[in-house]
Regions:
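Aromatic- and acidic-residue-enriched carbohydrate-binding clefts of CAZyme catalytic domains
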Residues: 150, 185-248, 259-277
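Active-site neighborhood of glycoside hydrolase catalytic domains
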Residues: 248-251, 258-315
Length: 356
């Protein structure tokens, strides 16, 4: 028998809190929200109407107990529309890049499957010993010449691990590899507003955001960057295995993350989640300065690389914060191309006076 009561609003997303006990918390400005729980991807198991009695501030929360929901999936409904949770750990119907499925339901697993890390831990390579290699997961191995089995996926990067090691790099920096909305599939999109970062059009005439600097569900690895999301509800294994295999080669994993109007709470929760759940070694953040400083001074993240374009606040007691020297990127490209009058700028950006 299922028992339902008010939950913990501070514990956002869907969390298992005990044997057959689960907490759900969703922030929304509506007067009521409906929690939908599915047995698999199609069969609706139960509906929970969350009215004002389940609300604390703008957060609806409930605790469900009495039945095993470890393999169940969920989403929310507002004004007759099914919407995914911003804290969703996985997202269904996103397994094909730039394809919007008819009658798609964007559901998330409540509990992820266990993963054997075999004692893996973040590597904590000092900055002075680091060489970053920035890649787009899909673009890096999608070519016919990549010589990997699963092209454009996290598994493809695993197959390139020996090559990356031979290059002498110490870290791969992944351009957005969480569930960004490249095609405008999520219902919270404003139909009159185009996502930022557009560079070409999709097949159906929709704007396509290839790079990922746009709206996103930041807690879920990008399903279309895996080889198994079309048939597995929990496809997170592939990202975790990529991190584990790269760590075995002495290569760190840095996640590039773009935030716009997300709250400092969500941003911090997100970084913590990726560090604890996926063992990533650092993040390159784009976001509000106040949120960046909150992340940088978070004791949970005190040994996690936190990188951005500038810092204006207190430094951590461990040397884990860094400025991302974007100016060097443009200068060195022009210098290597042989553009005129680049030597002085190149010398500046390779000296201690860079960006001072």
């Amino acid at each position: 028998m299922i028992n339902i009561k008010k939950g913990n609003p501070a514990q956002r997303g869907a969390q298992k809190t005990g044997s057959m006990s689960y907490n759900f918390a969703f922030a929304g400005v509506s007067d009521n929200i409906t929690l939908l729980i599915f047995d698999g991807r199609k069969n609706l198991k139960c509906r929970v109407e969350l009215d004002e009695t389940y609300k604390t501030g703008d957060v609806f929360s409930c605790n469900i107990s009495g039945e095993n929901l470890d393999k169940a999936m969920y989403c929310y409904e507002s004004d007759g529309k099914m919407i995914p949770d911003l804290y969703a750990k996985t997202v269904t119907c996103c397994s094909e890049f730039n394809k919007i499925q008819d009658n798609a339901r964007y559901l998330s697993r409540i509990v992820l499957d266990e993963f054997d890390w075999e004692g893996d831990m973040p590597l904590q390579t000092p900055y002075e010993d680091s060489i970053f290699y920035k890649i787009h997961v899909r673009g890096y191995t999608k070519s016919r010449t990549s010589m990997v089995k699963h092209k454009g996926t996290f598994d493809g990067i695993i197959q390139k691990a020996d090559y990356l090691k031979e290059l002498g790099i110490t870290a791969v920096e992944l351009m957005p590899a969480y569930e960004y909305d490249e095609a405008g599939r999520f219902p919270d999109y404003d139909e009159n507003e185009k996502p930022s970062g557009m560079y070409k059009m999709a097949e159906q005439g929709r704007p396509l955001n290839y790079w990922g600097y746009c709206n996103a569900l930041h807690f879920a690895p990008k399903a279309s960057f895996t080889s198994c999301a079309s048939y597995k509800n929990d496809y997170t294994y592939e990202f975790k295995n990529m991190v584990k295999q790269l760590h075995k080669k002495g290569i760190e994993v840095i996640m590039e993350m773009y935030f716009s109007d997300e709250t400092p709470e969500l941003i911090t929760d997100c970084i913590r989640y990726w560090v604890m759940e996926y063992h990533i070694d650092g993040v390159h953040l784009y976001g509000p300065p106040c949120a960046l400083n909150v992340c940088a001074t978070d004791p949970v993240l005190s040994y996690t690389k936190i990188i951005t374009v500038f810092w204006d606040g207190k430094r951590g007691h461990v040397r884990h914060m860094a400025d991302y020297n974007d100016g060097y990127l443009g200068i060195i490209r022009r210098f290597l191309k042989g553009d005129d009058n680049q030597l002085e700028d190149c010398l500046l950006y390779t000296s201690d006076a860079a960006d001072e």
